[in-house]
């Protein structure tokens, strides 16, 4: 069974860094893995993306090639099925959206852990399979397989009013490793749609972080730029997921397109010396 880089870092008390993709193109995962070793995992935000079971297998292969862990974000109605298939494809962490109750939280843990007595990290319902994670038929049903399910990282979204109201009881469910506050959904659930900076939203986020840290659960924060991490680091947060592929591309196309249109519609100016133009052209390909 493949070592779980994210689990190893969590158990060692080390900080972790991930990034999000909505694309199922495996090359993106390889590029992230080749980005200087800075990323511990890739979150495939499947809640918002179209994908097939074959896509999950191919992403799993790319994760192995890149030497990084994979996390998948799944929607509420698909907890068990998508978690099971993603882990079988080679993902080693599952982020569960829309948790509201203790029973929801128990369902999240059960969708990941092995159905065997004595689990270190919560009750499970997952059985033996013949999938990529076990080499199809090489390690299925082995003690190493059950241990790998026990090591899979279970993450829940705290993003609903009901979840925040039940937060203490939810976080006491055995087997939850990490929490992620979702300001957009939470603001909607309290009637402040789109107002992520509302005082009640900030209060709920702080409550989530403090409640998690109190229990030894790891709070994770999603950011777009490194400069946003500082206030959270001061609170004790060590786990971040930075950037989304769609956001990176959208921002590039918008800003670069705007700049180019400005250049193309600007009044003609005196051309630069030939040597300078040639140098600029060469720089493009460096």
Regions picked out by a protein language model, each given a short descriptive name:
Residues 1-20, 135-151, 206-207, 213-214, ...:
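N-terminal amphipathic alpha-helix/helix-capping segment at the start of soluble metabolic enzymes
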Residues 2-4, 244-248, 252-286:
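Extended, intrinsically disordered, low-complexity segments
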Residues 53-80, 84, 112-118, 146-149, ...:
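Alpha-helix-loop-beta-strand connector modules within alpha/beta enzyme cores
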Residues 91-104, 179-188, 238-256:
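Glycine-rich phosphate-binding active-site loops on the catalytic face of alpha/beta enzymes
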């Amino acid at each position: 069974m493949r070592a779980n880089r994210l689990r190893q870092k969590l158990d060692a008390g080390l900080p972790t860094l991930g990034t999000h993709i909505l694309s199922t193109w495996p090359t993106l995962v390889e590029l992230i893995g080749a980005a200087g070793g800075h990323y511990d995992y890739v979150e495939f935000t499947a809640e918002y993306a179209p994908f097939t079971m074959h896509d999950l297998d191919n992403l799993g292969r790319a994760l192995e090639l890149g030497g990084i862990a994979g996390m998948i974000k799944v929607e509420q109605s698909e907890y068990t099925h998508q978690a099971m298939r993603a882990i079988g494809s080679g993902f080693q962490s599952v982020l569960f959206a829309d948790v509201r109750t203790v029973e929801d939280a128990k369902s999240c843990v059960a969708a990941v852990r092995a159905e065997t007595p004595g689990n270190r990290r919560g009750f499970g319902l997952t059985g033996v399979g013949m999938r990529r994670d076990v080499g199809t038929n090489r390690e299925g049903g082995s003690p190493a397989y059950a241990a790998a399910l026990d090591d899979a990282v279970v993450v829940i979204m705290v993003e609903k009013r009901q979840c925040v109201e039940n937060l203490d009881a939810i976080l006491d469910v055995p087997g939850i490793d990490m929490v992620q506050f979702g300001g957009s959904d939470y603001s909607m659930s309290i009637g402040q749609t789109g107002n992520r900076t509302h005082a009640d939203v900030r209060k709920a986020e702080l409550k989530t972080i403090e409640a998690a840290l109190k229990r030894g659960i790891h709070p994770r924060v999603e950011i777009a730029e490194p400069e946003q991490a500082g206030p959270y680091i001061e609170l004790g947060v060590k786990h971040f997921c930075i950037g989304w592929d769609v956001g990176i591309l959208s921002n590039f196309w918008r800003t670069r397109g705007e700049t180019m249109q400005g250049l193309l519609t600007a009044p003609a100016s005196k051309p630069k010396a030939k040597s300078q133009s040639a140098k600029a052209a060469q720089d493009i390909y460096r």
